[in-house]
Amino acid sequence: SGTAAAYGEAEVKGFELAVSEINAKGGINGKKVKLESMDDKGDATEASNAYNKLVGDNNVLAVAGPTISATTAAVAPLADQSKLVTIAPAATSDSIETGNYLFRTCFKDSYQGEVAARFAAENLKVKKVAVLYGTGDPYSSGVGEAFAKAAEKLGLEVVDKESSSSADDTEYSAQLQKIQASGAELLYAPYYYSVAGPYIIPQARSVGFDGYVMGPDGYDGLKLTGDKAQYNKTYYTTHYSADDNTNSKVQDFIKSYKSKNNAEP
């Protein structure tokens, strides 16, 4: 649950599918795999508490998660202390220290910030950009700063940088009015889909901003929120699109996931 609930829900469904397929083939070394899911609610304290419970269970051999940067940052030191293999699927913040027991299967914010800036300059051909990010979240602030730094290196003018006190506020009109007045052709707003979709993008349009809106992988999920028409001229970077992958194993996974969950993976 929490700000990025859709990610956790999809991951659990994917894990459940994998476990069922592994066990149907006899398990691992003849032993059945058991999946135990715990909800960190997108909160650092909840994540630490849940992780410590798993550490205390001698039957737990590895942990997949937490998902997002804020919760993974809280768990990172615990992984090495407990020597429990932990894999974070989407913790992109550069501030997270991976060690001997914590790994991630995603790119870092410095990378996606650079890619987004390059796309803005080379594909969208804009000259002036603005950034809006949440100062209280390592993901939002990290990728926001990475984009701004990369944009300046590419010769783009960062005409305005605005911030919110957290990455899950619901009112951004004051900041967006300043961005609209700045002459920005593109707004880079690194928040999660659950904030960008219902709040930031429609509020940007309401104050008269009709330029491009761009975000990071946290925008993956926009189709779950808001009026899809408002996403015209909206772009985001993401790790991977299963739909575009022709590998037979990937397509088999998509088919099995849809069949089991009646939903897109």
Describe the predicted segments one by one.
Residues 34-38, 159, 235:
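General small-molecule cofactor/ligand-binding pocket signal
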Residues 201-265:
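Extracellular/periplasmic periplasmic-binding protein-like sensory domains
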Residues 1-16, 38-45, 67-68, 132-142, ...:
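Extracytoplasmic "Venus flytrap"
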Residues 7-13, 25-95, 164-172, 194-195:
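Beta-alpha junction/loop-to-helix N-cap segments that form part of ligand/metal-binding clefts
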Residues 16, 20-27, 52-60, 76-84, ...:
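Sec-exported extracytoplasmic/periplasmic mature domains
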Residues 12-19, 48-52, 64, 72-80, ...:
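Extracytoplasmic/secreted envelope proteins and their assembly/folding machinery
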Residues 102-167, 186:
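An alpha-beta-alpha
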Residues 54-67, 87-89, 128-133, 183-194, ...:
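Periplasmic-binding protein-like
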